[in-house]
Amino acid sequence: VAPSRGLGDVYKRQVKSVVPAGEYKVTDTIAVITDADGRDHDITMVQRWPVKQAVRCYREKPRPSRVMETGVRAIDTFNPLAEGGTGFIPGPFGAGKTVLQHAISKQADADVIIIVACGERANEVVEIFKEFPELVDPRTGHKLMERTIIICNTSNMPVAAREASVYTGMTIGEYYRSMGLKVLVMADSTSRWAQALREMSNRLEELPGQDAFPVDLSAIISNFYARAGLVKLNNGKTGSVTVSYTHLRAHETELHL
């Protein structure tokens, strides 16, 4: 993506050189352009985007009408998840929320699976790294790891990173959705994400709400889940971001703390 001077900035650039077709890393220079001031800029395949700002490069966002097959018969039969919709897995400690999410990530009918480990135990993430490279996707015949993105911010990592991890997963999902792919974002867990929001709010000395959570917590959560959805792109293709997250009940979260 060509560099800009700010939001909404448009100015003329001249392509100076382009590398031939082939295989390159995202950090390799693939082109050099010259701006209106005569300065050269190296262009790579790295794209930068603020994670809290939604990617809205689509023409239309219709109402979800198809089912996202999770591969778990009980969910698909009694409580189906819409493609481009949101769903959650509630339960107390030890109920198997993370195990169920791992089962869905292995069998779900999606092109890209994004797993966000937000405040979870590190050993649960290590299991994914051990299992997924060995398992084969029955739809494509490739390894499951080839379609899986893992964002690891476990409980021993900084609070700021834990807060940003969920936004990062959604932004990556929107990036692949703009390519016309079917994306499933799985966050584990949003309860610990809310705890991170509370800690950051307290450190910034913001006005506290109920149980010391941010006053605008409901708006933050609703704006985040509003970024999911089925979209029609400008080229006529359709893409989707479906969100599934685990949730621990409030009083159990406080007891755990």
Segments (PLM) and residue ranges:
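Single conserved hydrophobic/aromatic residue that forms the stacking wall/gate
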Residues: A2-L7, Y11, H247-A250, E254-L257
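Short beta-strand segments of a lipoyl-like beta-sandwich/carrier module
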Residues: D9-K25
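Flexible beta-alpha connector loops of hexameric P-loop NTPases
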Residues: P64-S65, I114-C118, T148-A164, R203-A219
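Conserved P-loop NTPase nucleotide-binding/switch module
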Residues: G96-V99, I104, A108-D111, A122-N123, ...
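The Walker A (P-loop) glycine that initiates the GxxxxGKT/S ATP-binding motif of P-loop NTPases
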Residues: G91
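Conserved P-loop
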Residues: S105-M145
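P-loop NTPase nucleotide-binding/switch module
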Residues: D9, D28, V32-G85, Q101-A103, ...
